[in-house]
Regions:
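ATP-binding/phosphotransfer module of carbohydrate and carboxylate kinases, centering on a glycine-rich
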Residues: 14-160
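Hydrophobic alpha-helical segments and helix pairs
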Residues: 1-19
Length: 160
């Protein structure tokens, strides 16, 4: 599952623009913003662009800031994407906290959309607060490898 990733936000945003283009949803300036960033001017051009070998994960992720910005400006579809992704990420965190019996977990999100997109980070923080009111939001003191090394060190130094 890609919940919370820039790729996921951008991919869903692009799907949203396709529904706008074919009339399933009302048009919004977000459609042109995303299409312009992709260098496309039509529904067909978008479909052709996404299957090109040089269009990949990073290109979808590059669309995420446009989706988050549109959500902040009350674009209904973009708001649903941001809120849905934040809720999915929150459910993942809640599940881990429950499985580990953590009552007031320290939540540290590092990298990607949570780090670089303030509007998305705020949505995630709000979703976590709703599902785990006692959760605390912390800052990363390293990357995942640093955390794994600290945990391994703690296990090896613990008296048996």
């Amino acid at each position: 599952e890609g919940a919370g990733s820039g790729f996921d936000l951008g991919h869903q945003g692009l799907q949203l623009t396709m529904r706008m283009a074919d009339g399933r949803l009302p048009d919004h300036p977000l459609r042109l913003q995303i299409w312009n960033q992709m260098g496309c001017d039509s529904h067909a051009a978008v479909k052709a662009r996404v299957v090109q070998q040089d269009f990949g994960t990073a290109d979808f992720a590059a669309l995420a800031p446009l989706v988050v910005e549109a959500a902040a400006k009350n674009c209904p579809g973009a708001e649903e994407i941001v809120q849905g992704s934040a809720a999915a990420l929150s459910r993942c965190i809640s599940t881990v906290a429950q499985q580990l019996s953590l009552r007031s977990p320290l939540v540290v999100c590092h990298g990607g959309a949570v780090t670089h997109l303030q509007g998305f980070r705020t949505a995630v923080q709000q979703a976590i607060h709703q599902s785990i009111p006692e959760a605390r939001w912390g800052k990363a003191k390293g990357d995942a490898c640093d955390g794994a090394l600290l945990m391994a060190e703690a296990l090896t130094l613990r008296p048996r």
